[in-house]
């Protein structure tokens, strides 16, 4: 069953069970591209925005109070996820996001009119009052981006950080061999090594919390090209204040609306911090899977949980699957960063027209990282243990302990001891005594692996 909807191009039939109107239907038919829906976070952000603009327009005497209340009620339904099925459009549409803006306008008007009566609320004249797609879509981008960071990504960073803190403390006095250039180096403790991973999380959280302030200023109030045509002079300030009340986030009105419409450097900047997190997560996961390599022919200093059979042909194999998953996510996020960077450069004249692909990739990065960090934490990090016997053996076998002799006998003599031990496949102690450079007592006094860690 269908109904007829109308816009400036004429009539078009729409599924009678759906709440969208003519412009949404045209977009649905004209842009059957891929299967990437406009992120629902953007729809919810639009609903927050439309609720705020309705309140401000009513306060300014432009919109009837009854209409503002009806619009706000529908917006609440959208935010609560009750109307998700009525937002069918894909990311691959107009670069300004106009069609998704109109999708939201049409659904709000349609549902509100079910209560007020047909034709009472118009999607353009009422729901979109004092607005343009050109300032609403970038505003929705910032609302959605900030909310996703606060509710999804930052909590997962904190949780992973806490697990690493626990592991760090547990193994702070377990001496192991350090490695630089993939070669043996001087000793440190496993706790010290893990503290480096922990600091990666701590610092990246700080980078994000600092950078995300850049997306608090909003474009709303700029309307079509940044001049604020058809909106009151302080409309942006009032809407930002209302959004702050609704969300609890300290949004402000961007001081330069021309910038806010044509540049997405704030989003690009914040995603740079997200990319940095992805880089460090790849480093941490790679360290763990290499240190857990084996069990008999690899490094084998760490043991990871056996979550599932590792091979379809080799029985008993345990693979570092969580490490592999999160490193693939990290690679995807790095690719997303390239896309965002290129798209952010396309602010021709007064408007960037790559907005949907920017926010799509931004939100995807957050979701993938948050999900993979949760999975990695629960299924790998929490069950990660040290193979203390293997670690002790490798410390005792290491030639790099000779570095501790440098202050006592000099670099060249210490190097000769290490070379002799390597060439004759003996222990460092045996080689040191054989050279006559040190006595057994001196060796035992000066070669103290725990002391070498400077704990």
UniProtKB/Swiss-Prot annotation:
InterPro entries xref list: Fum_hydII (IPR005677), Fumarase/histidase_N (IPR024083), Fumarase_C_C (IPR018951), Fumarate_lyase_CS (IPR020557), Fumarate_lyase_fam (IPR000362), Fumarate_lyase_N (IPR022761), L-Aspartase-like (IPR008948)
Pfam families (UniProt xref): FumaraseC_C, Lyase_1
Example of a GO cellular component annotation carried by this entry: cytoplasm
Binding annotation for substrate: 96-98, 122-125, 132-134, 180, 312, 317-319
Pathways involved: Carbohydrate metabolism; tricarboxylic acid cycle; (S)-malate from fumarate: step 1/1
SUPFAM superfamilies, A to Z: L-aspartase-like
Note: There are 2 substrate-binding sites: the catalytic A site, and the non-catalytic B site that may play a role in the transfer of substrate or product between the active site and the solvent. Alternatively, the B site may bind allosteric effectors.
Quaternary context: Homotetramer.
Protein name per the record: Fumarate hydratase class II
Lineage, opening ranks: Bacteria, Bacillati, Bacillota, Bacilli, Bacillales
């Amino acid at each position: 069953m269908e109904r007829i909807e109308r816009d400036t191009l004429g009539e078009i039939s729409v599924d009678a069970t759906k709440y969208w109107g003519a412009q949404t239907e045209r977009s649905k038919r004209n842009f059957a591209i891929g299967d990437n829906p406009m992120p629902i976070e953007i729809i919810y952000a639009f609903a927050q925005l439309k609720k705020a603009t309705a309140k401000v327009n009513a306060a300014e005497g432009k919109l009837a109070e009854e209409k503002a209340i009806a619009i706000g009620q529908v917006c609440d339904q959208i935010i609560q996820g009750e109307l998700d099925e009525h937002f069918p459009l894909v990311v691959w549409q107009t670069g300004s996001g106009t069609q998704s803006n109109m999708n939201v306008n049409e659904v709000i008007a349609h549902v509100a009119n079910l209560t007020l009566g047909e034709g009472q609320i118009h999607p353009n004249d009422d729901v979109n009052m004092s607005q343009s797609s050109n300032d609403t879509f970038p505003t929705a981008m910032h609302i959605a981006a900030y909310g996703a960071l606060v509710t999804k990504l930052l909590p997962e960073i904190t949780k992973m950080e806490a697990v690493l803190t626990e592991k760090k403390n547990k193994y702070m006095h377990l001496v192991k061999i350090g490695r630089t250039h993939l070669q043996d180096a001087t000793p440190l403790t496993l706790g010290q090594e893990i503290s480096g991973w922990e600091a990666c999380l701590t610092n990246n959280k700080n980078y994000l919390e600092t950078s995300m302030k850049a997306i608090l200023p909003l474009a709303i109030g700029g309307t079509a090209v940044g001049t604020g045509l058809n909106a009151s002079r302080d409309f942006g300030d009032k809407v930002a204040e209302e959004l702050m009340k609704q969300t609890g986030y300290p949004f402000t009105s961007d001081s330069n609306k021309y910038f806010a419409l044509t540049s997405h450097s704030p989003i690009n900047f914040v995603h740079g911090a997200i990319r940095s997190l992805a880089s460090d997560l790849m480093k941490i996961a790679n360290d763990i899977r290499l240190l857990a390599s084996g069990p008999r022919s690899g490094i084998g200093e760490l043991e990871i949980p056996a979550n599932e059979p590792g091979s379809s042909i080799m029985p008993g194999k345990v693979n570092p699957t969580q490490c592999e998953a999160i490193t693939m996510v990290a690679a995807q996020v790095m690719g997303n960063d390239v896309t965002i960077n290129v798209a952010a450069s396309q602010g021709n004249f007064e408007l960037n027209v790559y907005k949907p692909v920017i926010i799509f990739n931004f939100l995807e990065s957050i979701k993938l990282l948050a999900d993979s960090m949760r999975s990695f934490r629960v299924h790998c990090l929490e069950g990660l243990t040290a193979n203390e016997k293997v670690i002790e053996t490798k410390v005792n076998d290491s030639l790099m302990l000779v570095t501790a002799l440098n202050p006592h006998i000099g670099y060249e003599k210490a190097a000769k001891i290490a070379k002799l031990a390597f060439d004759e496949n003996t222990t460092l102690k045996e080689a040191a005594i054989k050279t006559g450079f040190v006595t057994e007592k001196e060796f035992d006094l000066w070669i103290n692996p725990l002391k070498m860690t400077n704990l």
